Amino acid sequence: MKFSFNRLVTQGWKTWERHPASAWVLSILWLLLISFLAFFWNLGSTGLIDETEPLFAEAARQMTVTGDWITPFFNGATRFDKPPLIYWLMAIAYQTFGVNEFAARLPSALTGLALTAMVFYTLRYFGSPTGDWGQGRGGEGEKVLLNSETNQQPNHLLTKAPVIPSSQWQSWLVACLGAAMVALHPQTLFFGRTGYSDMLLSACMGGALLAFFLGYAQPERGTVQARWYLTFYILIALAILTKGPVGVVLPGLIIAAFLLYVGKAREVLGEMRLVRGALIVLALSLPWFILVIWRNGEAYIDSFFGYHNLERFTSVVNDHQGPWYFHLLIVLIGFAPWSIGLPAAISFAGTPWAIAQTKVFQRRNWQQLPRKAHLGLFALFWFLIVLGFFSIAVTKYFSYTLPLMPAAAILLALWWSHKIVQGQIFHQHNGDLKLTSLVSIILFLVLAIACFLCPQWLGDDPSMPNLGLRISQAGLSVIGAVIWGVSAIAGTVLLLRSQTHWLWGVKFLGFVAFLMFVIMPASGIIDSERQLPLRQIAQSVVQVQAPGEKLLMIANGFEKPSLVFYTQRTVTFLDDPSEAASYLKNVDKQARPESLLLIATPKSLKKTGLAPNQYQEITQAGIYQLVRVSRVKVL
């Protein structure tokens, strides 16, 4: 069976190479499939998720209502957290598809698709050693890595290895692996399906870095190189319009460190025409900043540059704090199940491709290799600098590591494709792959146990008290346990049969099955428990609110901005329940509202001190009540 399977794979590779057009068609179908699963499937089937997503969605809606595309507003106040690009894209989607969840999330999904395609393209052309695996010029039985810039053979980079008859199959393999890994993991899955700005930032920043490498790797093709560098500058400008200074600071640090290490800083910066590029970036990004500062003055400068940039790096903002290793844990969890192989992939990336005799991270060897062989090293700098930058930052938040995920996917794809070559062609199975496989099997077992027991842990959120019961009744805990249990069994079989180079397939199929049969149904249940009651309350508000009647919510420290989006009304959020009665007494007397609408839980409603005869219950949904409080009775 083992022989027939290997023969089938080999015949498939040969067919793949004989029909390059078919290879492209199949690859495009592969990209569309994984992108559909990761980003577009049931994209608008659930409501906006409090607290962050409705902030973006409503600010974009306000732009379509007011026609002010310069200053973002939310709930009657300016919102200076982020630059405008995400709002602009959402607003355009609203005008095309209507104001709904699908339109709010479409920019994230499209940029997720674009980033996945960009990773695929880069790996397709530069993801195998020097781009011509097995087509060495050193004669039968050996591989030579040729320095394309000097056209000389560095003798100390000569390694003996069986010649692989062709190279194209590995280029397609590593590209397909990388595309799957960059799209199918928890962190990209979340941000690619929600209306945050983080997926847009990751796509702009990641696309810019990949465009830089595509230009860097082709010095002999001047026109092509210039186009990729132009693309780099445009995407940097878009990254700035998405997140601000970090959109240029992080790529700048990554590229500077990489070029200094390979000793090509002056040479490459000259090729990039840095001054012209800086002018392009400024021309695209600076006008909006000038306009928003001109319109809002010091308030914008203090809020955006001071609070949301400088203070986030130097102090804790919004109580988002954590230990120095916080982002290591986020990578481990957020990039699962692929993250188990990252230590081995990072070590592999530090060694020039297929050079068994060289020392890890030996700079001289990298400097003598052709540029097109540097993708793994570039991804390594990308990964480590983003991780280090946000580990140093005092404010810790789980979205900050998203821009390093494309680099992690590239590192893992290079490593896995190398292991498949070793196992399938050379029948070699190194210790790092066996150890990674063993740890992966343990992870599968842990996930199976966690899925089975999770209903017992899901009753602590007061906004979703019945979540654990609903998950159990739907059978999702058992389904999840079966999926990961079967994955553990399959991984064990591969380990015992010395076929661990195919474990990536088990991870892929396991994660896709978990996405289809557990994550998607569970997201619907979570929405019905957590967000649907708020949408029902919002619908009631729209139906019963009288002209001039104020709308309040007792937030208890957790505001629900989705109420603003779904009611399309201004909502006053109160942290202290006792503030409700005093608010009504002190409200603008000129308006003289006879009553106000109050949204609260039964517990927080009691804490307001209001007697039952002072309010009228209009409706109840989930844990929330909508009541009308009489001003006359309170006074």
Language model features with spans:
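Membrane-integral, polyisoprenol-dependent glycosyltransferases
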Residues: 1-429, 454, 564, 620-623
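Membrane-embedded architecture of ER/inner-membrane glycosylation machinery
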Residues: 2-15, 19-20, 24, 230, ...
